[in-house]
């Protein structure tokens, strides 16, 4: 494997300000499994409501499969004017009280998963991150007219909030990079937890703000961060009104929703559909996702011009012996660990 540190550049001055903060890191991907576009909407919401600065930028050109996921291009009259830009960025964020946290967001890597996962894990270790949290939408046989159920999974069972319904047994599913990262974080002894917002399967391809808001509230609960809801309540109200109007136009859809409402109400004691039913729903959703090549653009972040384009292997890299090194000077083959918070 090539050196993971050559996958990114960073801001040395901003890196220094992270000493002693022991932040939470949120990773919200525009990726493989995200029913209701929960993760994407959360990332856009946080970037629009929280102060942020670009700390690390990954070289996504090494991670993206352009033929497998082709960029959208704009042609005007007689020339091309633009193409989708892919990015993966780690930003320093401030919540409503001024508390520092980190946000890793962008398109999930197509290539070099081991190398990218190792790079992110090493950054997490050097930044002395105390907890890694993700959120995404899970396609389920639930109605939009009932409260969004949240289920959790984590690298350690004692990280899981209670109650946490047992929503699935054991099954094999195609992996997304977020899940792959969580697995490797657990192997490295890093605490990581994911928030799964249950999204009606018939809304999996469109934004479902009720689930977005439920996921945000769950994140604030498990992290202690004060994250503003901003306009999410208004977006939820408008979104639900649009869904209700569409349902009212179709007798067939009304019957499906009514059936799901009955099932939901019968399961109010916490029991959920069987693993086979959930597995079938997930497999159907994942099959649909696999057949797509159209790219959904990631939430925009701070301009790349704000980053010090330091040579990742140069003297200013966190693992080199220069003044910007967040750990001790490297005296051997093993890169230094973080000092902050210790």
Spell out what each predicted region is.
Residues 57-84, 192-212, 319, 327-332:
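Flexible, D/E/H-enriched segments
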Residues 203-342:
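A conserved C-terminal secondary-structure "cap"
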Residues 99, 107-159, 181:
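Internal, conserved structured core segments that host functional sites
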Residues 1-106:
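N-terminal short beta-loop-beta anion/metal-coordinating cradle
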Residues 56, 102-104, 133, 191-196:
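Hydrophobic/aromatic beta-strand patches that form the interior of the parallel beta-sheet core
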Residues 30-32, 62-63, 107-110, 137-139, ...:
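Acidic, glycine-rich active-site loops and adjacent beta-strand->loop/helix elements
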Residues 141-222, 226:
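Catalytic cores of processing enzymes, dominated by hydrolases/peptidases
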Residues 37-41, 111, 115, 172, ...:
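Conserved active-site and cofactor/substrate-binding residues in soluble primary-metabolism enzymes
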């Amino acid at each position: 494997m090539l050196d993971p540190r050559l996958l990114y550049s960073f801001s040395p001055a901003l890196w220094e300000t992270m000493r002693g903060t022991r932040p939470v890191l949120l990773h919200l991907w525009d990726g493989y499994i995200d029913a209701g576009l929960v993760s994407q909407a959360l990332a856009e919401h946080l970037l629009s409501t929280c102060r942020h600065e670009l700390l690390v930028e990954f070289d996504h050109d090494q991670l993206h499969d352009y033929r497998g996921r082709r960029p959208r291009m704009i042609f005007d009259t007689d020339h091309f004017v633009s193409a989708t830009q892919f990015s993966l960025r780690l930003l320093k964020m401030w919540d409503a009280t001024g508390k520092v946290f980190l946000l890793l967001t962008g398109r999930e890597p197509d290539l070099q998963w081991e190398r990218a996962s190792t790079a992110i894990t090493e950054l997490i270790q050097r930044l002395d991150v105390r907890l890694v949290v993700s959120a995404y939408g899970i396609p389920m046989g639930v109605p939009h007219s009932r409260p969004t159920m949240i289920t959790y999974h984590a690298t350690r069972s004692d990280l899981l909030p209670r109650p946490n319904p047992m929503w699935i047994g054991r099954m094999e599913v195609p992996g997304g990079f977020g899940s792959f990262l969580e697995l490797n974080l657990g192997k490295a002894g890093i605490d990581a937890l994911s928030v799964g917002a249950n999204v009606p399967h018939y809304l999996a391809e469109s934004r479902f703000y009720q689930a977005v808001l439920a996921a945000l509230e769950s994140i604030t609960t498990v992290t202690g961060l004060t994250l503003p809801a901003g306009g999410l309540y208004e977006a939820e109200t408008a979104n639900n009104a649009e869904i209700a109007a569409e349902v009212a136009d179709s007798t067939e859809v009304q019957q499906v929703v009514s059936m799901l409402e009955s099932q939901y109400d019968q399961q109010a004691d916490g029991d959920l559909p069987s693993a086979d039913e959930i597995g079938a729903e997930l497999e159907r959703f994942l099959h649909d996702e696999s057949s797509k090549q159209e790219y959904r653009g990631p939430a925009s972040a701070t301009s790349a011009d704000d980053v010090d384009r330091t040579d990742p292997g140069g003297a200013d890299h966190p693992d080199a012996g220069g003044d910007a090194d967040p750990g001790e000077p490297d005296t051997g083959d093993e890169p230094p660990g973080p000092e902050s918070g210790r």
